[in-house]
């Protein structure tokens, strides 16, 4: 490699985007060109951000690492999406992550933008040892109640795994019907990498499904509101009545049925 003084700013930038040596970084720091100084400042800011992110991901693996040390190889995180909406199913997902993965930005799905969730959704499916999605339909929610329907969706997700889980980490709940060692963690989607991954799979899977249901029932705006009781959704309920995918046991829907 030619000396840095003979390199253009573009050439220096290309080297910094690889894995520059300490010698090269020192040479950049000593170069008086403003463009090089800006590049080296940006390089160290990005390096520090990557370090902080690596430490955050490491903290998210605290539960998993302890379980791995205790001999549990396949740890399945479980979470749900859609307990609160007035329409559509409640969807659960389960995900078994490998010990080494590359999922920058992995977090509770509620803390991510839609575009970031979509990106991680694909990355998780590519890198996971195993994953599966389960759901409970509106009629099941009405017949059981939302809590029991959520547990049913979670159970179906676990049963859909092609890889047998040795331990379950579940967001906030426990599933006594599954005879698998397990632990419920309050705010688990913000504390466990496996649960965070499951939360993204559940959220994006449900969002995609609501987009498809919007094509069947376009008058309710499901692609936008995902079934939640927005002002526009409530107005559509009053105008068009209750659809086959509305949860009849939920108060705003029940009120509309009572009017009819």
Curated annotation (Swiss-Prot):
PROSITE patterns, A to Z: RNASE_H_2
Cystine bridges: none
Compartments, record wording: Cytoplasm
GO cellular component: a single term: ribonuclease H2 complex
GO molecular function (one): manganese ion binding
GO BP: DNA replication, removal of RNA primer; mismatch repair
The protein's required cofactors: Mn(2+); Mg(2+)
Binding positions (a divalent metal cation): 79-80, 171
Cofactor note: Manganese or magnesium. Binds 1 divalent metal ion per monomer in the absence of substrate. May bind a second metal ion after substrate binding.
EC number: 3.1.26.4
Keywords in alphabetical order: Cytoplasm, Endonuclease, Hydrolase, Manganese, Metal-binding, Nuclease
Domain RNase H type-2 intervals: 73-260
InterPro entries: RNase_HII, RNase_HII/HIII, RNase_HII/HIII_dom, RNaseH-like_sf, RNaseH_sf
Statement: the UniProt record of this protein carries the keyword Nucleotide-binding: no
Keyword Manganese: yes
Reactions catalysed: Endonucleolytic cleavage to 5'-phosphomonoester
UniProt similarity note: Belongs to the RNase HII family.
Function text: Endonuclease that specifically degrades the RNA of RNA-DNA hybrids.
Protein name: Ribonuclease HII
Originating organism: Desulfitobacterium hafniense (strain DSM 10664 / DCB-2)
